[in-house]
Amino acid sequence: MEKKVEAILEFDKIKKQLTEFASSSLGEQAILELAPATDFQVVQKTQLETEEGAKIIRLRGSAPITGLTDVFAHLKRLEIGGDLNGLEIYQIGSNLRVSRQMKNFMNDLLEIGVELPILGALSDELLVLKEVEEDIAISVDESGKVLDTASEALSTIRRTLRRTEDRVREKLESYLRDRNASKMLSDAVITIRNDRYVIPVKQEYKGHYGGIVHDQSASGQTLFIEPQSVVDLNNERKALQAKEKQEIERILAEISASLAAWINEIHHNTFILGRFDFIFAKARFGKAMKAVTPHLSDAGVVHLIAARHPLLDAAKVVANDIYLGEDFTTIVITGPNTGGKTITLKTLGLLTLMAQSGLQIPAQEDSTIAVFEHVFADIGDEQSIEQSLSTFSSHMTNIVSILEKVNQKSLILYDELGAGTDPQEGAALAIAILDASHEKGASVVATTHYPELKAYGYNRVHATNASVEFNVETLSPTYKLLIGVPGRSNAFDISRRLGLSENIITEARSLVDTESADLNDMISSLEEKRNLAETEYEEARELARGADNLLKDLQKEITNYYQQKDKLIEQASEKAATIVEKAEAEAEEIIRELRTMQLNGAAGIKEHELIDAKTRLGNAKPKTINKTIPQAPKQKPHVFQEGDNVRVLSLGQKGTLLNKISDKEWNVQIGIIKMKIKTADLEYIQPEKPKKQRIITSVHSSGSPAKSELDLRGERYEDALQKVDKYLDEALLAGYPQVAIIHGKGTGALRTGVTEYLKNHRMVKSIRFGAAAEGGNGVTIVEFK
């Protein structure tokens, strides 16, 4: 397929819209590389994969593809022995998580019997590396930061580091609390300069604290000093930070080495996930356009029902039926230049490119489109200023190139064929070019405003005329395509509507030859009759649709009634059973106690009475109630006919009858697949309206149950408050009436912060310090509402 044609028909704009539905750069890249296929089997497969994606979207609403990243460059670095940073490792882990989720997601669909031959096979290729995924999950977070859980050594280093930092802060805070602080310090804050904790000291008091000056303010009035008392602690902190960095590098190198053993598997998983993203993007794009999967023809047959141009406003675009390849292989659309004829050409051409690219098309169900080896288009003014060619020469150069390449598997779209030269010669050339195109076996749709070509559709058995309807009242085209009706001149009617004198119009009519006038009158009459027939057909179809809907609604209500009845009976039975089981358990306990009393010598308790009471209790259990099976209303046996909608019982799939092979067998179209099916395996159905899918989301808790106490000792202030917030949620979910928060005694800063936070928590009823046995004021007891 020529790139030039893709540009003329604006296929690049379709691809740009399609990229908006991709979830990753991998999906976007696949879309950018998308091109129409010409092999019929390939087109079938790409259409089927899109249909399977659409089926999944209908059933589940979405697929777990979020989090997919292009990691091919990371894998290349591993291949040459390099190490990855934390973010790169996280991205590989994210892809492994998406691989596992996608495989489980697909397995769930396949287990409930959803037919997904292509996507099912694709998911089978995904390899789940759960251990590798989990190792990454406990080692790095989504920002690429290495977690404390990555190694015991790192956890110990960071714990020691936090304690050291707390000691530094506590020492510096003592300076801030000093009674002379307001006099000697510019501000009562602890800050950091050169990665060391400092306090802002006024210039005149710099000798009071000793230590090291790390910075000064712009005015020079404030010095940022590290007091001598914390120099050693800060040095210790720096040493711990160096150890932390060293341990992080070791962890990243270790994980990189372990990932290097799985390069091929991760590479393949990422490629497969990119395919999934691309396929789901096609499916979501089709859903947004209200598009359908077309039937495919390998014989040049096109039958588009209510086809719409996908780049025009969906609320305003006029849908048209376009058919070609059965009764005729050439359509000549005649009429004035303002009639929207070019839109018809572009609609057919663009929908062909979309279908051959595996995309659904904006048309109605049961539309058929042909798979062509070549699509040629001579549309618009492609005049080349560099070559100094005229409009006519430019078009003719293009047409010559087309006729050299065309074959019987080609679709040619000619816009204003023969224009740009003398009308008589132009019309003659147009006829000759159409004949030459037909002789090559091509399917052709051409537009022209030459009246001489109106006769072409009548004089050639392989051709038909068409036109775009024009509304004389509004002086504008309706953009409705009328196949079989040639375009007519509206000059006299338009002139009259615009106020031209009737005398002038009458004189003009007299100058037109009788044959032309009669032809225009005939075309006008034909248009009126066609419009009337279409109106009556639509009304009849609407009435039939209404009757079908009434029948379906009635059958649905009957089914719902019986289902509701059975559900209520089942609920009542289950409730009764629960009550009896509870009573039975209580009775068993009483009987057990009575037997104990009997053994201990109690009088008046007889064994046979206990057995009899237990038997009566067992008989009190409700019996299973048989569900009502609703019987479908009896209908007269249906005589199958071509075009009937049917259900293939053995497959559980819907299809359409194509033709009868024998009394016992039919050819059935199921999606894009044609199959031979036994008549006994068919059930007649009416097409149903698409039902809105209700998406049910289940939320499951995971992880270990919350403990009844939270130990914050050794935690930094900010980290501690975050842990308290998370812990309270977990404790509430676990149902604890009260919990203990251990913060230690220390300076009281952490205790004060925790207390203030708890006072403002909406689920906390009361707080108190622990009793002596509970830990004293180093523990806060929290009671929930």
Swiss-Prot record:
Q: What is its EC number?
A: 3.1.-.-, 3.6.4.-
Q: Which InterPro entries match?
A: DNA_mismatch_repair_MutS_C (IPR000432), DNA_mismatch_repair_MutS_core (IPR007696), DNA_mismatch_repair_MutS_sf (IPR036187), MSSS (IPR046893), MutS (IPR045076), MutS2 (IPR005747), P-loop_NTPase (IPR027417), Smr_dom (IPR002625)
Instruction: Please tell me which top-level EC class this enzyme sits in.
Output: hydrolase
Could you state one GO biological process linked to this protein? negative regulation of DNA recombination
Q: What PROSITE patterns is this protein classified in?
A: DNA_MISMATCH_REPAIR_2 (PS00486), SMR (PS50828)
Chain sites annotated for binding ATP:
G335, P336, N337, T338, G339, G340, K341, T342
Which Cys pairs are S-S linked? none
- Keywords attached to this entry: ATP-binding, DNA-binding, Endonuclease, Hydrolase, Nuclease, Nucleotide-binding, RNA-binding, rRNA-binding
Q: Which domain of life is it from?
A: Bacteria
Say yes or no: keyword Transmembrane helix present: no
What are the Smr domain coordinates in residue numbering? 710-785
GO molecular function, one example? endonuclease activity
Under the subunit heading, UniProt states: Homodimer. Binds to stalled ribosomes, contacting rRNA.
**Function per UniProt:** Endonuclease that is involved in the suppression of homologous recombination and thus may have a key role in the control of bacterial genetic diversity. Acts as a ribosome collision sensor, splitting the ribosome into its 2 subunits. Detects stalled/collided 70S ribosomes which it binds and splits by an ATP-hydrolysis driven conformational change. Acts upstream of the ribosome quality control system (RQC), a ribosome-associated complex that mediates the extraction of incompletely synthesized nascent chains from stalled ribosomes and their subsequent degradation. Probably generates substrates for RQC.
Q: Which family does the entry's similarity section mention?
A: Belongs to the DNA mismatch repair MutS family. MutS2 subfamily.
Return the HAMAP family for the record. Answer: MutS2
User: Could you tell me what this protein is called?
Assistant: Endonuclease MutS2
Which species does the entry assign this protein to? Listeria monocytogenes serovar 1/2a (strain ATCC BAA-679 / EGD-e)
